[in-house]
Protein backbone atom coordinates (compact mmCIF):
# COMPACT_ATOMS: atom_id res chain seq x y z
CA UNK A 1 0.00 0.00 0.00
CA UNK A 2 2.75 2.47 0.96
CA UNK A 3 4.65 1.70 -2.27
CA UNK A 4 1.49 2.32 -4.29
CA UNK A 5 0.93 5.64 -2.52
CA UNK A 6 4.51 6.75 -3.01
CA UNK A 7 4.33 5.93 -6.73
CA UNK A 8 1.02 7.75 -7.02
CA UNK A 9 2.46 10.76 -5.22
CA UNK A 10 5.55 10.76 -7.47
CA UNK A 11 3.40 10.72 -10.61
CA UNK A 12 1.22 13.57 -9.36
CA UNK A 13 4.27 15.57 -8.26
CA UNK A 14 5.94 15.06 -11.64
CA UNK A 15 2.78 16.11 -13.44
CA UNK A 16 2.50 19.19 -11.23
CA UNK A 17 6.11 20.17 -11.92
CA UNK A 18 5.60 19.68 -15.66
CA UNK A 19 2.48 21.87 -15.59
CA UNK A 20 4.30 24.57 -13.62
CA UNK A 21 7.26 24.52 -16.03
CA UNK A 22 4.92 24.72 -19.02
CA UNK A 23 3.03 27.60 -17.42
CA UNK A 24 6.29 29.44 -16.71
CA UNK A 25 7.45 28.93 -20.29
CA UNK A 26 4.12 30.14 -21.73
CA UNK A 27 4.20 33.17 -19.43
CA UNK A 28 7.77 34.04 -20.46
CA UNK A 29 6.92 33.61 -24.14
CA UNK A 30 3.83 35.80 -23.87
CA UNK A 31 5.87 38.45 -22.03
CA UNK A 32 8.57 38.53 -24.72
CA UNK A 33 6.12 38.36 -27.62
CA UNK A 34 3.91 41.14 -26.23
CA UNK A 35 6.86 43.51 -25.74
CA UNK A 36 8.20 43.09 -29.28
CA UNK A 37 4.87 42.65 -31.10
CA UNK A 38 4.82 46.29 -32.24
CA UNK A 39 8.05 45.82 -34.21
CA UNK A 40 7.14 45.30 -37.88
CA UNK A 41 8.42 42.31 -39.78
CA UNK A 42 7.67 39.82 -42.55
CA UNK A 43 4.79 37.40 -42.15
CA UNK A 44 5.72 33.78 -41.39
CA UNK A 45 5.74 31.60 -44.48
CA UNK A 46 5.30 28.25 -42.69
CA UNK A 47 5.22 26.62 -39.26
CA UNK A 48 8.93 27.46 -39.14
CA UNK A 49 8.14 31.17 -39.36
CA UNK A 50 10.84 32.95 -41.37
CA UNK A 51 13.58 30.65 -40.08
CA UNK A 52 14.15 28.76 -43.31
CA UNK A 53 14.37 32.06 -45.26
CA UNK A 54 16.83 33.60 -42.80
CA UNK A 55 19.18 30.61 -43.01
CA UNK A 56 18.63 29.61 -46.63
CA UNK A 57 21.86 29.16 -48.57
CA UNK A 58 20.10 29.93 -51.88
CA UNK A 59 17.61 32.64 -50.81
CA UNK A 60 19.26 34.08 -47.68
CA UNK A 61 20.77 37.13 -49.39
CA UNK A 62 17.50 37.84 -51.19
CA UNK A 63 15.64 37.71 -47.85
CA UNK A 64 18.15 40.11 -46.27
CA UNK A 65 17.70 42.56 -49.16
CA UNK A 66 13.90 42.33 -48.91
CA UNK A 67 13.70 43.06 -45.19
CA UNK A 68 16.18 45.93 -45.49
CA UNK A 69 14.22 47.46 -48.35
CA UNK A 70 10.85 47.12 -46.59
CA UNK A 71 11.64 47.49 -42.87
CA UNK A 72 14.98 49.27 -42.70
CA UNK A 73 17.36 48.66 -39.80
CA UNK A 74 14.99 46.92 -37.37
CA UNK A 75 12.42 44.16 -37.84
CA UNK A 76 10.92 41.17 -36.08
CA UNK A 77 11.66 37.72 -37.51
CA UNK A 78 9.16 34.91 -36.91
CA UNK A 79 10.53 31.65 -35.53
CA UNK A 80 9.06 28.12 -35.40
CA UNK A 81 5.64 27.79 -33.78
CA UNK A 82 5.87 27.94 -30.00
CA UNK A 83 9.22 29.77 -29.96
CA UNK A 84 10.01 33.41 -29.29
CA UNK A 85 10.47 35.69 -32.28
CA UNK A 86 13.85 37.38 -32.71
CA UNK A 87 14.83 40.98 -33.40
CA UNK A 88 16.88 41.67 -36.52
CA UNK A 89 19.03 44.75 -35.89
CA UNK A 90 21.22 46.88 -38.17
CA UNK A 91 20.83 50.25 -36.43
CA UNK A 92 24.34 51.61 -35.64
CA UNK A 93 23.43 53.39 -32.39
CA UNK A 94 21.56 50.39 -30.99
CA UNK A 95 24.45 48.11 -31.97
CA UNK A 96 26.88 50.54 -30.35
CA UNK A 97 25.02 50.23 -27.05
CA UNK A 98 24.83 46.44 -27.37
CA UNK A 99 28.58 46.14 -27.90
CA UNK A 100 29.74 48.86 -25.51
CA UNK A 101 27.55 50.46 -22.85
CA UNK A 102 25.17 47.52 -22.42
CA UNK A 103 27.52 44.71 -23.44
CA UNK A 104 27.29 43.03 -20.01
CA UNK A 105 23.55 42.56 -20.59
CA UNK A 106 24.06 40.40 -23.69
CA UNK A 107 25.87 37.16 -24.43
CA UNK A 108 25.95 34.37 -26.99
CA UNK A 109 22.78 32.24 -26.99
CA UNK A 110 23.00 29.01 -25.02
CA UNK A 111 22.86 26.84 -28.14
CA UNK A 112 25.92 28.60 -29.56
CA UNK A 113 27.89 27.75 -26.42
CA UNK A 114 26.73 24.13 -26.66
CA UNK A 115 27.69 23.86 -30.33
CA UNK A 116 31.11 25.44 -29.77
CA UNK A 117 31.72 23.21 -26.75
CA UNK A 118 31.08 20.15 -28.91
CA UNK A 119 33.41 21.45 -31.64
CA UNK A 120 36.10 23.27 -29.65
CA UNK A 121 35.90 21.67 -26.21
CA UNK A 122 34.38 22.98 -23.00
CA UNK A 123 37.25 25.38 -22.36
CA UNK A 124 37.68 27.07 -25.75
CA UNK A 125 37.35 30.86 -25.90
CA UNK A 126 34.20 30.72 -28.02
CA UNK A 127 32.53 28.28 -25.63
CA UNK A 128 32.95 30.27 -22.41
CA UNK A 129 31.14 33.28 -20.99
CA UNK A 130 31.16 35.64 -18.02
CA UNK A 131 34.16 35.71 -15.70
CA UNK A 132 35.79 32.69 -17.37
CA UNK A 133 35.62 34.32 -20.79
CA UNK A 134 37.08 37.53 -19.35
CA UNK A 135 39.95 35.55 -17.75
CA UNK A 136 40.81 33.89 -21.04
CA UNK A 137 40.76 37.12 -23.00
CA UNK A 138 42.98 38.76 -20.41
CA UNK A 139 45.87 36.37 -21.07
CA UNK A 140 45.14 35.83 -24.79
CA UNK A 141 45.05 39.55 -25.67
CA UNK A 142 48.85 39.99 -25.40
CA UNK A 143 49.42 36.85 -27.52
CA UNK A 144 47.53 38.55 -30.36
CA UNK A 145 49.12 41.93 -29.64
CA UNK A 146 51.85 43.80 -31.54
CA UNK A 147 54.74 42.43 -29.46
CA UNK A 148 54.06 38.86 -30.64
CA UNK A 149 52.72 39.65 -34.09
CA UNK A 150 55.96 41.42 -35.05
CA UNK A 151 57.46 37.90 -35.42
CA UNK A 152 54.79 36.88 -37.96
CA UNK A 153 55.82 38.62 -41.25
CA UNK A 154 58.76 36.27 -42.04
CA UNK A 155 56.49 33.26 -41.45
CA UNK A 156 53.73 34.71 -43.65
CA UNK A 157 56.16 35.67 -46.41
CA UNK A 158 57.62 32.15 -46.41
CA UNK A 159 54.13 30.63 -46.90
CA UNK A 160 53.30 33.21 -49.59
CA UNK A 161 56.50 32.49 -51.53
CA UNK A 162 55.77 28.75 -51.51
CA UNK A 163 52.27 29.43 -52.82
CA UNK A 164 53.62 31.67 -55.58
CA UNK A 165 56.22 29.05 -56.55
CA UNK A 166 53.32 26.69 -57.27
CA UNK A 167 51.49 29.38 -59.26
CA UNK A 168 54.61 30.11 -61.35
CA UNK A 169 54.86 26.45 -62.32
CA UNK A 170 51.16 26.26 -63.20
CA UNK A 171 51.35 29.44 -65.32
CA UNK A 172 54.76 28.79 -66.90
CA UNK A 173 53.23 28.24 -70.35
CA UNK A 174 50.93 31.25 -70.20
CA UNK A 175 47.48 32.10 -68.90
CA UNK A 176 45.42 29.20 -67.62
CA UNK A 177 42.21 28.61 -65.70
CA UNK A 178 42.81 27.73 -62.05
CA UNK A 179 40.34 26.93 -59.28
CA UNK A 180 41.46 29.53 -56.74
CA UNK A 181 39.05 28.15 -54.13
CA UNK A 182 41.21 25.03 -53.91
CA UNK A 183 44.39 27.06 -53.51
CA UNK A 184 42.82 29.66 -51.22
CA UNK A 185 41.81 26.93 -48.78
CA UNK A 186 45.29 25.41 -48.87
CA UNK A 187 47.20 28.66 -48.35
CA UNK A 188 44.90 29.92 -45.58
CA UNK A 189 45.28 26.61 -43.73
CA UNK A 190 49.06 26.85 -44.03
CA UNK A 191 48.99 30.44 -42.73
CA UNK A 192 47.27 29.15 -39.59
CA UNK A 193 49.67 26.21 -39.41
CA UNK A 194 52.79 28.32 -39.74
CA UNK A 195 51.87 31.45 -37.81
CA UNK A 196 49.29 30.34 -35.27
CA UNK A 197 50.23 26.81 -34.22
CA UNK A 198 53.74 26.31 -35.59
CA UNK A 199 53.23 23.27 -37.85
CA UNK A 200 53.44 22.78 -41.59
CA UNK A 201 49.95 21.64 -42.56
CA UNK A 202 50.39 21.89 -46.35
CA UNK A 203 53.60 22.02 -48.39
CA UNK A 204 51.68 23.92 -51.13
CA UNK A 205 53.56 21.92 -53.76
CA UNK A 206 51.53 21.26 -56.92
CA UNK A 207 52.30 17.53 -56.79
CA UNK A 208 51.37 17.13 -53.10
CA UNK A 209 47.95 16.24 -51.76
CA UNK A 210 46.23 19.01 -49.77
CA UNK A 211 45.68 18.48 -46.07
CA UNK A 212 42.32 16.73 -45.74
CA UNK A 213 41.47 18.81 -42.69
CA UNK A 214 41.00 21.92 -44.85
CA UNK A 215 38.43 20.19 -47.06
CA UNK A 216 36.68 18.54 -44.09
CA UNK A 217 36.48 21.89 -42.33
CA UNK A 218 34.88 23.51 -45.39
CA UNK A 219 32.35 20.69 -45.65
CA UNK A 220 31.71 20.96 -41.91
CA UNK A 221 30.90 24.66 -42.17
CA UNK A 222 28.56 24.03 -45.11
CA UNK A 223 26.78 21.26 -43.20
CA UNK A 224 26.39 23.41 -40.08
CA UNK A 225 24.96 26.25 -42.19
CA UNK A 226 21.89 24.43 -43.50
CA UNK A 227 18.47 25.41 -42.09
CA UNK A 228 18.02 21.86 -40.75
CA UNK A 229 21.35 22.02 -38.90
CA UNK A 230 20.61 25.51 -37.55
CA UNK A 231 17.21 24.34 -36.28
CA UNK A 232 18.78 21.31 -34.64
CA UNK A 233 21.47 23.44 -32.99
CA UNK A 234 18.97 25.95 -31.67
CA UNK A 235 16.07 23.80 -30.50
CA UNK A 236 17.34 20.22 -30.17
CA UNK A 237 21.03 20.28 -29.31
CA UNK A 238 20.73 22.21 -26.00
CA UNK A 239 18.12 19.71 -24.81
CA UNK A 240 20.14 16.56 -25.40
CA UNK A 241 23.34 18.23 -24.18
CA UNK A 242 21.73 18.90 -20.81
CA UNK A 243 20.45 15.35 -20.43
CA UNK A 244 23.55 13.20 -20.31
CA UNK A 245 27.33 13.17 -20.52
CA UNK A 246 29.30 14.17 -23.65
CA UNK A 247 30.03 10.46 -24.15
CA UNK A 248 26.30 9.72 -24.24
CA UNK A 249 25.68 12.61 -26.62
CA UNK A 250 28.35 11.31 -29.03
CA UNK A 251 26.74 7.85 -28.86
CA UNK A 252 23.34 9.41 -29.58
CA UNK A 253 24.69 11.37 -32.55
CA UNK A 254 26.12 8.14 -33.98
CA UNK A 255 22.56 6.82 -34.24
CA UNK A 256 21.35 9.72 -36.41
CA UNK A 257 21.23 8.49 -40.05
CA UNK A 258 22.13 11.82 -41.60
CA UNK A 259 24.98 12.60 -44.03
CA UNK A 260 25.18 16.10 -42.51
CA UNK A 261 25.71 14.66 -39.03
CA UNK A 262 28.41 12.34 -40.40
CA UNK A 263 30.24 15.26 -42.05
CA UNK A 264 30.17 17.37 -38.89
CA UNK A 265 31.09 14.43 -36.66
CA UNK A 266 34.12 13.49 -38.79
CA UNK A 267 35.22 17.12 -38.92
CA UNK A 268 34.98 17.51 -35.12
CA UNK A 269 36.81 14.27 -34.38
CA UNK A 270 39.57 15.07 -36.87
CA UNK A 271 39.94 18.52 -35.32
CA UNK A 272 40.12 17.09 -31.81
CA UNK A 273 42.65 14.36 -32.67
CA UNK A 274 44.94 16.72 -34.59
CA UNK A 275 44.83 19.36 -31.87
CA UNK A 276 45.76 16.94 -29.09
CA UNK A 277 48.63 15.45 -31.09
CA UNK A 278 50.05 18.84 -32.05
CA UNK A 279 49.74 20.19 -28.52
CA UNK A 280 51.76 17.30 -27.09
CA UNK A 281 54.45 17.72 -29.76
CA UNK A 282 54.62 21.43 -29.09
CA UNK A 283 54.87 20.94 -25.33
CA UNK A 284 57.61 18.32 -25.66
CA UNK A 285 59.63 20.60 -27.95
CA UNK A 286 59.37 23.43 -25.43
CA UNK A 287 60.45 21.19 -22.58
CA UNK A 288 63.49 20.05 -24.58
CA UNK A 289 64.22 23.58 -25.79
CA UNK A 290 67.12 24.54 -28.06
CA UNK A 291 67.34 22.43 -31.21
CA UNK A 292 63.88 20.92 -30.69
CA UNK A 293 62.29 24.34 -31.11
CA UNK A 294 64.51 25.44 -33.99
CA UNK A 295 63.59 22.27 -35.88
CA UNK A 296 59.91 23.26 -35.90
CA UNK A 297 58.60 24.97 -39.02
CA UNK A 298 57.95 28.23 -37.16
CA UNK A 299 61.23 28.15 -35.17
CA UNK A 300 59.13 28.63 -32.03
CA UNK A 301 57.80 32.04 -33.14
CA UNK A 302 54.15 30.98 -33.51
CA UNK A 303 51.31 32.10 -31.23
CA UNK A 304 50.67 28.71 -29.58
CA UNK A 305 54.32 28.39 -28.57
CA UNK A 306 54.01 31.75 -26.83
CA UNK A 307 50.80 30.63 -25.11
CA UNK A 308 52.25 27.33 -23.87
CA UNK A 309 55.55 28.90 -22.81
CA UNK A 310 53.99 31.70 -20.79
CA UNK A 311 50.74 30.19 -19.53
CA UNK A 312 51.06 26.37 -19.45
CA UNK A 313 54.67 25.53 -18.54
CA UNK A 314 54.74 27.88 -15.58
CA UNK A 315 54.45 27.48 -11.83
CA UNK A 316 51.59 29.86 -11.11
CA UNK A 317 48.15 29.51 -9.62
CA UNK A 318 46.57 30.96 -12.77
CA UNK A 319 48.38 28.62 -15.19
CA UNK A 320 46.39 27.20 -18.11
CA UNK A 321 45.73 23.46 -17.93
CA UNK A 322 46.34 21.19 -20.89
CA UNK A 323 42.66 20.66 -21.70
CA UNK A 324 42.12 24.40 -22.04
CA UNK A 325 45.29 24.84 -24.11
CA UNK A 326 44.12 22.08 -26.46
CA UNK A 327 40.77 23.86 -26.78
CA UNK A 328 42.64 27.02 -27.82
CA UNK A 329 44.47 24.94 -30.44
CA UNK A 330 41.13 23.82 -31.85
CA UNK A 331 39.73 27.35 -31.73
CA UNK A 332 42.61 28.75 -33.78
CA UNK A 333 42.31 26.01 -36.40
CA UNK A 334 38.53 26.29 -36.54
CA UNK A 335 38.05 30.06 -36.49
CA UNK A 336 41.04 31.37 -38.38
CA UNK A 337 41.23 29.08 -41.39
CA UNK A 338 37.84 29.59 -42.99
CA UNK A 339 37.64 33.29 -42.10
CA UNK A 340 40.95 34.07 -43.79
CA UNK A 341 40.12 31.81 -46.75
CA UNK A 342 36.90 33.73 -47.36
CA UNK A 343 38.65 37.12 -47.20
CA UNK A 344 41.51 36.00 -49.48
CA UNK A 345 39.23 34.53 -52.15
CA UNK A 346 36.82 37.45 -52.13
CA UNK A 347 39.69 39.94 -52.56
CA UNK A 348 41.15 37.98 -55.48
CA UNK A 349 37.75 37.74 -57.17
CA UNK A 350 37.15 41.49 -56.80
CA UNK A 351 40.56 42.33 -58.23
CA UNK A 352 39.79 40.08 -61.21
CA UNK A 353 36.53 41.96 -61.72
CA UNK A 354 38.21 45.38 -61.41
CA UNK A 355 41.38 45.28 -63.57
CA UNK A 356 41.89 49.03 -63.11
CA UNK A 357 42.21 48.63 -59.33
CA UNK A 358 44.39 45.55 -59.84
CA UNK A 359 46.77 47.57 -62.06
CA UNK A 360 46.89 50.55 -59.68
CA UNK A 361 47.56 48.28 -56.71
CA UNK A 362 50.37 46.50 -58.59
CA UNK A 363 51.97 49.86 -59.38
CA UNK A 364 51.72 51.02 -55.75
CA UNK A 365 53.38 47.89 -54.41
CA UNK A 366 56.07 47.73 -57.10
CA UNK A 367 56.97 51.35 -56.36
CA UNK A 368 57.33 50.54 -52.67
CA UNK A 369 59.39 47.43 -53.48
CA UNK A 370 61.80 49.45 -55.63
CA UNK A 371 63.09 51.16 -52.50
CA UNK A 372 63.11 48.03 -50.34
CA UNK A 373 65.76 45.41 -49.77
CA UNK A 374 63.80 42.16 -50.04
CA UNK A 375 60.29 41.74 -48.66
CA UNK A 376 58.43 44.84 -47.56
CA UNK A 377 58.35 45.35 -43.82
CA UNK A 378 54.92 45.23 -42.27
CA UNK A 379 55.25 48.90 -41.31
CA UNK A 380 55.71 49.77 -45.00
CA UNK A 381 52.75 47.60 -45.97
CA UNK A 382 50.58 49.44 -43.45
CA UNK A 383 51.56 52.74 -45.05
CA UNK A 384 50.32 51.78 -48.54
CA UNK A 385 47.00 53.64 -48.97
CA UNK A 386 45.44 51.68 -51.84
CA UNK A 387 46.31 48.31 -50.29
CA UNK A 388 44.66 49.45 -47.08
CA UNK A 389 41.64 50.72 -49.02
CA UNK A 390 41.22 47.39 -50.84
CA UNK A 391 41.47 45.55 -47.52
CA UNK A 392 38.91 47.76 -45.74
CA UNK A 393 36.43 47.92 -48.61
CA UNK A 394 36.45 44.16 -49.13
CA UNK A 395 35.80 43.46 -45.45
CA UNK A 396 33.16 46.20 -45.31
CA UNK A 397 31.10 44.90 -48.20
CA UNK A 398 31.83 41.19 -47.72
CA UNK A 399 32.43 40.37 -44.03
CA UNK A 400 33.22 36.66 -43.54
CA UNK A 401 30.38 36.44 -40.97
CA UNK A 402 27.11 38.11 -42.05
CA UNK A 403 25.48 38.31 -38.64
CA UNK A 404 25.95 37.33 -34.99
CA UNK A 405 23.25 36.39 -32.48
CA UNK A 406 23.13 37.72 -28.92
CA UNK A 407 20.59 37.04 -26.15
CA UNK A 408 19.52 39.62 -23.55
CA UNK A 409 20.10 38.56 -19.93
CA UNK A 410 17.86 41.34 -18.63
CA UNK A 411 15.43 43.90 -19.98
CA UNK A 412 17.30 46.46 -22.09
CA UNK A 413 16.27 49.70 -23.80
CA UNK A 414 18.35 50.50 -26.90
CA UNK A 415 18.25 53.95 -28.56
CA UNK A 416 17.79 54.04 -32.34
CA UNK A 417 19.74 56.27 -34.71
CA UNK A 418 16.98 55.80 -37.27
CA UNK A 419 13.49 55.72 -35.66
CA UNK A 420 11.02 53.15 -37.00
CA UNK A 421 7.25 53.10 -37.38
CA UNK A 422 5.56 50.46 -35.25
CA UNK A 423 2.78 48.15 -36.38
CA UNK A 424 0.28 50.49 -34.69
CA UNK A 425 1.66 53.52 -36.56
CA UNK A 426 3.57 55.09 -33.67
CA UNK A 427 7.13 56.37 -34.08
CA UNK A 428 9.69 54.36 -32.08
CA UNK A 429 13.00 56.06 -31.24
CA UNK A 430 14.10 53.30 -28.89
CA UNK A 431 13.86 49.55 -28.80
CA UNK A 432 12.66 47.60 -25.76
CA UNK A 433 14.44 44.24 -25.66
CA UNK A 434 12.91 41.89 -23.05
CA UNK A 435 15.05 39.46 -21.09
CA UNK A 436 15.50 36.23 -23.05
CA UNK A 437 15.12 37.84 -26.48
CA UNK A 438 17.58 36.89 -29.20
CA UNK A 439 18.90 39.84 -31.21
CA UNK A 440 20.49 39.12 -34.59
CA UNK A 441 23.20 41.76 -35.06
CA UNK A 442 23.43 42.30 -38.81
CA UNK A 443 27.07 42.98 -39.63
CA UNK A 444 26.37 43.02 -43.34
CA UNK A 445 23.34 45.26 -42.81
CA UNK A 446 25.17 48.03 -40.98
CA UNK A 447 28.30 47.72 -43.17
CA UNK A 448 26.17 48.17 -46.30
CA UNK A 449 23.65 50.73 -45.02
CA UNK A 450 22.89 53.40 -47.64
CA UNK A 451 21.85 55.73 -44.81
CA UNK A 452 25.42 55.52 -43.49
CA UNK A 453 27.58 54.95 -46.58
CA UNK A 454 25.53 56.72 -49.21
CA UNK A 455 23.79 55.55 -52.41
CA UNK A 456 26.83 53.52 -53.56
CA UNK A 457 26.96 51.48 -50.34
CA UNK A 458 26.48 48.22 -52.29
CA UNK A 459 29.30 49.04 -54.72
CA UNK A 460 32.87 47.84 -54.13
CA UNK A 461 34.75 51.13 -54.25
CA UNK A 462 38.17 51.19 -52.51
CA UNK A 463 38.56 54.85 -53.44
CA UNK A 464 36.01 55.82 -50.79
CA UNK A 465 38.77 55.18 -48.22
CA UNK A 466 41.24 57.45 -50.02
CA UNK A 467 39.09 60.53 -49.36
CA UNK A 468 37.41 61.77 -46.18
CA UNK A 469 34.52 59.45 -45.30
CA UNK A 470 30.99 60.90 -45.42
CA UNK A 471 29.83 62.72 -42.30
CA UNK A 472 27.11 60.10 -41.95
CA UNK A 473 29.82 57.48 -41.32
CA UNK A 474 31.62 59.61 -38.76
CA UNK A 475 28.44 60.48 -36.87
CA UNK A 476 26.85 57.02 -37.02
CA UNK A 477 28.54 55.77 -33.82
CA UNK A 478 28.98 52.44 -35.55
CA UNK A 479 30.73 49.96 -33.24
CA UNK A 480 33.84 48.17 -34.42
CA UNK A 481 37.32 47.31 -33.20
CA UNK A 482 38.55 48.59 -36.58
CA UNK A 483 37.50 52.01 -37.79
CA UNK A 484 34.04 52.49 -39.29
CA UNK A 485 33.19 48.83 -39.98
CA UNK A 486 31.68 46.17 -37.73
CA UNK A 487 33.33 43.18 -39.40
CA UNK A 488 35.42 42.22 -36.36
CA UNK A 489 32.75 43.28 -33.84
CA UNK A 490 33.49 45.32 -30.73
CA UNK A 491 33.40 45.03 -26.96
CA UNK A 492 34.12 41.94 -24.87
CA UNK A 493 33.59 39.50 -27.75
CA UNK A 494 35.42 41.27 -30.56
CA UNK A 495 37.64 39.15 -32.81
CA UNK A 496 41.00 38.76 -31.08
CA UNK A 497 42.75 37.91 -34.33
CA UNK A 498 41.84 41.01 -36.35
CA UNK A 499 45.46 42.22 -36.48
CA UNK A 500 46.57 38.71 -37.46
CA UNK A 501 44.05 38.60 -40.34
CA UNK A 502 45.07 42.08 -41.50
CA UNK A 503 48.75 41.17 -41.57
CA UNK A 504 48.15 37.85 -43.31
CA UNK A 505 45.87 39.31 -45.97
CA UNK A 506 48.02 42.35 -46.76
CA UNK A 507 51.21 40.32 -47.10
CA UNK A 508 49.56 37.73 -49.35
CA UNK A 509 47.71 40.20 -51.58
CA UNK A 510 50.75 42.47 -51.96
CA UNK A 511 52.89 39.57 -53.19
CA UNK A 512 50.17 37.99 -55.32
CA UNK A 513 49.38 41.19 -57.22
CA UNK A 514 53.06 41.75 -58.06
CA UNK A 515 53.45 38.21 -59.35
CA UNK A 516 50.11 37.22 -60.86
CA UNK A 517 47.33 38.77 -62.95
CA UNK A 518 43.72 37.63 -62.55
CA UNK A 519 40.79 37.84 -64.97
CA UNK A 520 37.27 36.38 -65.02
CA UNK A 521 36.49 33.17 -66.91
CA UNK A 522 33.36 32.36 -68.90
CA UNK A 523 31.99 30.74 -65.72
CA UNK A 524 32.44 33.91 -63.68
CA UNK A 525 28.76 34.86 -63.67
CA UNK A 526 28.02 31.49 -62.07
CA UNK A 527 30.19 32.11 -59.01
CA UNK A 528 27.91 32.35 -55.99
CA UNK A 529 28.57 32.87 -52.28
CA UNK A 530 25.68 31.11 -50.51
CA UNK A 531 24.53 32.33 -47.11
CA UNK A 532 26.17 30.39 -44.27
CA UNK A 533 28.07 30.52 -40.99
CA UNK A 534 31.03 31.53 -43.11
CA UNK A 535 31.11 32.21 -46.83
CA UNK A 536 32.71 30.21 -49.64
CA UNK A 537 32.41 30.45 -53.45
CA UNK A 538 30.38 27.84 -55.37
CA UNK A 539 29.82 27.08 -59.05
CA UNK A 540 26.93 24.78 -60.01
CA UNK A 541 26.61 23.51 -56.44
CA UNK A 542 30.32 22.69 -56.05
CA UNK A 543 32.82 24.68 -54.01
CA UNK A 544 34.88 26.37 -56.71
CA UNK A 545 36.16 29.75 -57.95
CA UNK A 546 37.71 29.43 -61.43
CA UNK A 547 39.77 32.41 -62.62
CA UNK A 548 42.14 33.07 -65.51
CA UNK A 549 45.61 33.38 -63.99
CA UNK A 550 48.84 34.48 -65.66
CA UNK A 551 52.22 35.84 -64.60
CA UNK A 552 52.12 39.64 -64.20
Swiss-Prot record:
Q: Which of UniProt's keywords are assigned here?
A: Glycoprotein, Heme, Iron, Membrane, Metal-binding, Monooxygenase, Oxidoreductase, Transmembrane, Transmembrane helix
Task: Specify the protein name.
Answer: Cytochrome P450 monooxyhenase eriI
Principal localisation: membrane
As for subcellular location, the record says: Membrane
Q: What does this protein do?
A: Cytochrome P450 monooxygenase; part of the gene cluster that mediates the biosynthesis of erinacines, cyathane-xylosides that show unique biological activities, including leishmanicidal activity, stimulating activity for nerve growth-factor synthesis, and agonistic activity toward the kappa opioid receptor. Cytochrome P450 monooxygenase; part of the gene cluster that mediates the biosynthesis of erinacines, cyathane-xylosides that show unique biological activities, including leishmanicidal activity, stimulating activity for nerve growth-factor synthesis, and agonistic activity toward the kappa opioid receptor. The geranylgeranyl diphosphate (GGPP) synthase eriE catalyzes the first step in erinacines biosynthesis via conversion of farnesyl pyrophosphate and isopentyl pyrophosphate into geranylgeranyl pyrophosphate (GGPP).
Q: Which organism encodes this protein?
A: Hericium erinaceus (Lion's mane mushroom)
The enzyme's main class, written as a single word, is: oxidoreductase
Lineage runs: Eukaryota, Fungi, Dikarya, Basidiomycota, Agaricomycotina
Q: Does the keyword Ribonucleoprotein apply?
A: no
Amino acid sequence: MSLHLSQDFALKASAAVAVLLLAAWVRLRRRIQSKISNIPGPKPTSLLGNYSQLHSAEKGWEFFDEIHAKYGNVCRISTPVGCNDIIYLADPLALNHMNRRDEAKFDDPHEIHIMLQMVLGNKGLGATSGAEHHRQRKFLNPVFGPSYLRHMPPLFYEVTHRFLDAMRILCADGQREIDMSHWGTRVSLEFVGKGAIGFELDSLAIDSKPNLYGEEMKQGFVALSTPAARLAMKYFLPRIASLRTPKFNRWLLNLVPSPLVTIVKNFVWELDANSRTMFQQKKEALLKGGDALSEQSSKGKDLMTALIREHVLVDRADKVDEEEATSHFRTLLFAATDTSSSAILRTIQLLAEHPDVQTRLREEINTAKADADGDLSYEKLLALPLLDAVYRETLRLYPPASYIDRVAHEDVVLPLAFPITGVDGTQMSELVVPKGTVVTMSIVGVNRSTAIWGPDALVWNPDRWLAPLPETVKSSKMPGITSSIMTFLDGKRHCLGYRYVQMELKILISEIVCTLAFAPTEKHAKIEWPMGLTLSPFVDGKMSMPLKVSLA
